């Protein structure tokens, strides 16, 4: 029996901070809002749906947390149609963290699938880059807000 390969976005990066700190950066919106979305209705908790907002674009999304393993793994479902986003945290011997983000479950085909994979790969890469700058150096790069300035794109409308 042949296995069909599932289209998956995968991005990764070494973050020079302890795994517990990197993990909390995704659980706690008081931290996440420094590098990703601008507002959240709450912390990630299993079985709970929160709303993430990007106020500069006047868009929001509902995020369902499916699974959490402290300092190891977070699985969420979000988007329309919904896809799964897994965050995998691996502690490295030097006290840093290797973070992997996987996004899969796309109900698209052809050019629409290619476009979604491309957009989400770029988007999650931007998230990790912002996280790295913030946690390692305390710098808020404003990458998400600068990705689609009003003057060049009518994003989300």
Regions from the PLM with identified roles:
Residues 1-41, 157:
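Hydrophobic ligand-binding cavity/cleft-lining segments
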Residues 10-14, 53, 64, 88:
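Generic structural detector for well-ordered beta-strands
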Residues 19-20, 66-71, 89-98:
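A short, structured loop/turn motif at beta-sheet edges
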Residues 22-26, 32, 50, 65, ...:
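Hydrophobic pocket/interface hotspot
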Residues 27-28, 37, 70, 129, ...:
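Residues at helix-coil transition
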Residues 39-84:
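Glycine-rich portal/gate segments that line the openings of hydrophobic small-molecule binding cavities
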Residues 77-126, 131, 144:
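Beta-strand/loop substructures that line and gate deep hydrophobic ligand-binding cavities in soluble
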Residues 133-157:
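Short, highly charged C-terminal tails/helix-capping segments
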